[in-house]
Amino acid sequence: MRETDEQPVAGGAASTEGLETSIGYRFTDRRFLDEALTHRSWLNEVRSPTVPDNERLEFFGDAILGFCIGKMLLRHYPESREGALARMKSALVGEETLADLAAAVELGSYLRLGRGEERSGGRHRRSLLANALEALLAAMYLDGGMAPVERLVDAWFGPRLAGVAAGIKGRDFKTDFQELAQAQYGGLPRYVLVDTSGPAHDLRFTVAAYVGERLLGQGTGRSKKEAEQAAARQCLERLETGRCSAAP
């Protein structure tokens, strides 16, 4: 891509004060925030950029979020076993949830994007928003330590915890879907990897779920196992709400 002396899109807002108000945190060293909001497409269009892209922070933020959610789950469900905790964690930190949280604070409007990414709808792309949210959490940690991050994670995910626990705790979506598929379709599900995307340190896998030749749903996750669970969950929701016919 051709470098330019022109500034590419630098976010829809004149400043980040609105974002800081939304997350309840003011940055002391704004370089961390600038990095969290900088997509790699922006660097491709800027000559001699002074800030790196947010992919390293995204990597770090994923680990920080996992730690915070794990700590929250252990605190609220001290008797739960590892399998149930893992399923609750997976449901809480899935891409869709992170993208919803990012949209709620209008994170996309503050991102530094290249012109091509802007034109292709990157400001509203859910995978991009989820990644930027993780980068933002890492920036907060580097600037102010774990305390403000945990406060924000508790505020964001605490209200979701009871609902997730009620629907997810102890539930294996693949097993439940297999039983329902056998009952309604007379066959076993099969899972097909249809897409792998993202940088090497943060791959996203998309899996489609079939019974016979019938495509019933798909899901995305950070591992093939997580993607299969997400696909099975979507299939169950469709079957249980009548959005899929009960006969082939």
UniProtKB/Swiss-Prot annotation:
Main location as per UniProt: cytoplasm
Protein EC: 3.1.26.3
Cofactor(s) this protein requires: Mg(2+)
Listed InterPro entries: dsRBD_dom, RNase_III, RNase_III_dom, RNase_III_sf
Gene Ontology MF: a single term: ribonuclease III activity
Keyword field: Cytoplasm, Endonuclease, Hydrolase, Magnesium, Metal-binding, mRNA processing, Nuclease, RNA-binding, rRNA processing, rRNA-binding, tRNA processing
Cellular location(s): Cytoplasm
Keyword Methyltransferase recorded: no
Class of enzymatic activity (EC top level): hydrolase
UniProt xrefs under HAMAP family: RNase_III (MF_00104)
Family from the record: Belongs to the ribonuclease III family.
Oligomer status and interactors: Homodimer.
Name by which UniProt lists this protein: Ribonuclease 3
Species, as recorded: Geobacter sulfurreducens (strain ATCC 51573 / DSM 12127 / PCA)
Phylogenetic placement of the source organism: Bacteria, Pseudomonadati, Thermodesulfobacteriota, Desulfuromonadia, Geobacterales
